[in-house]
Amino acid sequence: MSQPSTRVSRLPEKQVSSRDALFALLDSTPLATVALTRAGHPVIFPTGFARVGDELVIHGSTGSPWLRALSEGASAAVSVTTLDGIVVARSGFESSFHYRSAVLFGVFERVPDDAKARCLEKLTDKFIPGCVAELRASTRKELAATLVLRMAIGDGNWSLKVSDGWPDDPPEDVEAGVWAGVIPMSVSFGDPQRAPDCPADIPVPESVRVKTR
């Protein structure tokens, strides 16, 4: 099967070829969407991920039929997107978003057993940096029940599109005297909520306190 084109056809001036820019996006958000065809039908699912060097790593239950299909060589498309702002133009037609959006095409492969624990630690630290040092190690049973997959981030199997400009209103709208601009967006974290079975005298771990400052 031939690989889909990675050339941006709609607004091609927004395509970015910088690998560093791709890595910055992948490292900034923990959620990806994975699409594949299984039993003749398209399926898609969200999943946490981490970039480990030049590979994109996901994990899940060994009982997942979709993950098993990926581990057996099903072609996949992975989408990662973050919203950075709302572009408020002088009309609904011209209003849009600031965003960074990447799509990767390829085939996942199983991470060998001797590298599985390290990849899972990378995934955990992606979500809460520093927490791996505060947690117990995964048990053999947990590792055996977990499927860890990786996809190579090559030189030609990804596409990155970035929109970061100002409203592009026609002159007659600019002259109408209506406000236009950008509302920046960012992710923030609230105060930690203690689990009902967690005694009050157990301190909040450093990794959680840093995340929520």
Label every PLM stretch briefly:
Residues 1-5, 115-213:
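C-terminal edge-of-domain segments
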